[in-house]
From Swiss-Prot:
Primary location: cytoplasm
Gene3D superfamilies: Hotdog Thioesterase
GO terms (BP aspect): fatty acid biosynthetic process; lipid A biosynthetic process
Family membership noted in the UniProt record: Belongs to the thioester dehydratase family. FabZ subfamily.
Record keywords: Cytoplasm, Lipid A biosynthesis, Lipid biosynthesis, Lipid metabolism, Lyase
EC number: 4.2.1.59
Gene Ontology molecular function, alphabetical: (3R)-hydroxyacyl-[acyl-carrier-protein] dehydratase activity
Domain of life of the organism encoding this protein: Bacteria
Catalysed transformations (reactions): a (3R)-hydroxyacyl-[ACP] = a (2E)-enoyl-[ACP] + H2O
Protein name: 3-hydroxyacyl-[acyl-carrier-protein] dehydratase FabZ
Lineage: Bacteria, Bacillati, Bacillota, Bacillota incertae sedis, Caldicellulosiruptorales
Cellular component terms (Gene Ontology): cytoplasm; membrane
Presence of the UniProt keyword Lipid biosynthesis in the record: yes
Amino acid sequence: MYNIDKILEIIPHRYPFLLVDRIIEVEEGKRAKGIKNVTINEPFFQGHFPSNPVMPGVLIVEAMAQVGAVAMLLKEEFKGKTPFFAGIDKVRFKKVVKPGDVLVIETELISLKGSIGKAKAVAMVDGEVVCEGELLFAIK
């Protein structure tokens, strides 16, 4: 398990764009499972939406990517590098994510050619899928 201090050593993301709080399982270069505690203090809730706060879907996708980035950046050849989105495929949002929810995010590498790869990812709240899809990335 990796706490926030270890996560900050691995990925380059920082507040307010760090969207993973803990890694609870990881296989270097293959898969990771992480947690995002969603609180009303998140800056995006000020405008999305003030009377009905909902986590923006694009930030759920970003959280999934950051969990995957932890697994990939543990590989020796990628340590200290920066992961970039190259695309997203088959992403579906199934339920809204609200303050107080705990996102449990799982990512698994599907393919990797050099520094370009694809992963499948799923985000769940209380065991129910809220978002799933495929993430394409490049590591530079």
